[in-house]
C-alpha cells in the first residue's frame, strides 16, 4: 500500500477524509500488527484492502493498493470476488454477526471452497473443511460439522471464523480484533494458533487491535495509526521498548502493569478527533504533551529513525 488516501461520504452527505497517505508493506510469512484507538481507521483500512467498502460510500481514493502482481484498486467486483477468499481472507471481530445462524459449520466453512472450486465433490470439500477446522484448533472437527453457530461456544465460533479464513490457504489473512470477546486464556491460545498457522503456511497476517499487549504477542512489525494517519511503524519489539512518537508512548503507558510494577493504566487525555475535525497540523497535536507551535503548521513528514523504523513527528522522543 503506497500513499493511500480515502474520503468517505458521511451520513449527512459531507465528505469525510478517513485515511491519509497510508504507506506500509506486509511481506510473505510476516505478521504485521495495526494498532490505534477505536476510530483510528484500522477497520476501514482492512475493508479497503479486501474491497468491501460500498462504492456508494466512497467519495474519493488516491494512491495504490498492490497485492502481488495485482493492483487492487483497478479490480471490478467480479475480479475481486475471485481474489477474496482464495488469495486473501478476513477474520471478522464478532462471529455471531459474521456467521449465518441458519447454516451449519460444514456449510459455512465449505461455502468458500464451493465458490472457488466449483467442480469439487462433497468429499473433497469435507476434506478441506476438516483440515481447516483442525488447523484452527478443533480437536475433533467431525463432531461439530453439523452444529449451528448458536450451538458453539464463543471460542469455537472464533475458531470457526479462523477456519473459514484458512480453508483456501490464502496468501494474506486480515484479522480484525478476532479475540476481543474472549477471556485472556482463550485469547492467548487462539493468537498462538493463528501465529503458528501463518508461519507454517508461509502466509502473511495483518492483525488489527486497539490492545498493544495483544499485538505484541502476535506481530513481527507494528504500525500505529491515529486519526487515519500512520504515525509510527517498525519492528514490534523495538517500537515497544523505545517508542519515538508521543502517541505510541501514550498507548504503551495505557497498558496495565499489575504484576511487576503494580500500577493501573494511564489514560490518554482528550478524545480522538472526528475525520472532519482533524487538527491542521499533526493529527495528535491536540492531545500531545510535547506539542509546540511548529506541530500545528502542517502534517509532519514520515522520517526514518532507524532500520525499517519510521515516525511522523517533528520532535520524536
Mark where each language-model region is.
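Conserved ABC transporter NBD signature motif
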Residues: 60-71
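Conserved ABC ATPase "signature" region
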Residues: 70-71, 123-143, 252-253
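ABC ATPase NBD coupling module
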Residues: 71-89, 115, 122, 238-243, ...
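Short catalytic/signature loops enriched in Gly
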Residues: 142-145, 233-317
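A short, proline-enriched helix->beta-strand linker immediately N-terminal to the Walker B motif
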Residues: 167-171
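P-loop NTP-binding/switch modules centered on Walker-like glycine-rich loops
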Residues: 174, 178, 182-263
Amino acid at each position: 500500500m503506497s500513499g493511500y488516501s480515502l474520503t468517505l461520504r458521511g451520513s449527512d452527505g459531507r465528505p469525510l477524509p478517513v485515511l491519509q497517505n497510508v504507506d506500509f508493506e506486509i511481506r510473505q510469512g510476516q505478521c504485521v500488527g495495526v494498532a490505534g484507538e477505536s476510530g483510528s481507521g484500522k477497520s476501514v483500512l482492512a475493508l479497503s484492502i479486501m474491497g468491501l467498502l460500498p462504492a456508494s460510500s466512497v467519495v474519493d481514493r488516491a494512491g495504490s493498493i498492490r497485492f502481488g502482481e495485482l493492483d487492487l484498486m483497478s479490480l471490478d467486483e467480479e475480479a475481486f470476488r475471485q481474489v477474496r477468499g482464495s488469495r486473501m481472507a478476513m477474520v471478522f471481530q464478532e462471529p455471531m454477526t459474521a456467521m449465518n445462524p441458519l447454516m451449519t459449520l460444514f456449510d459455512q466453512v465449505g461455502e468458500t471452497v464451493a465458490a472457488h472450486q466449483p467442480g469439487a465433490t462433497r468429499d473433497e470439500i469435507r476434506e478441506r473443511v476438516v483440515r481447516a477446522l483442525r488447523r484452527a484448533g478443533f480437536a475433533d472437527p467431525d463432531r461439530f460439522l453439523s452444529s449451528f453457530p448458536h450451538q458453539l461456544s464463543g471460542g469455537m465460533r472464533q475458531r470457526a471464523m479462523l477456519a473459514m479464513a484458512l480453508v483456501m490457504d490464502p496468501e494474506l489473512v486480515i484479522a480484525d480484533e478476532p479475540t476481543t470477546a474472549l477471556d485472556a486464556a482463550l485469547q492467548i491460545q487462539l493468537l498462538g494458533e493463528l501465529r503458528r498457522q501463518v508461519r507454517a503456511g508461509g502466509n502473511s497476517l495483518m492483525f488489527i487491535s486497539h490492545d498493544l499487549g495483544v499485538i505484541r504477542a502476535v506481530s513481527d512489525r507494528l504500525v500505529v495509526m491515529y486519526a487515519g494517519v500512520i504515525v509510527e511503524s517498525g519492528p514490534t519489539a523495538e517500537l515497544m521498548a523505545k517508542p519515538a512518537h508521543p502517541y505510541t508512548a501514550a498507548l504503551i503507558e495505557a497498558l496495565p502493569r499489575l504484576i511487576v510494577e503494580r500500577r493501573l493504566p494511564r489514560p490518554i487525555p482528550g478524545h480522538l478527533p472526528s475525520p472532519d475535525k482533524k487538527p491542521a497540523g499533526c493529527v495528535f497535536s491536540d492531545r500531545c504533551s510535547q506539542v509546540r507551535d511548529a506541530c500545528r503548521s502542517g502534517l509532519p513528514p514520515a522520517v526514518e529513525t532507524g532500520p525499517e523504523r519510521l515516525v511522523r513527528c517533528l520532535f520524536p522522543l
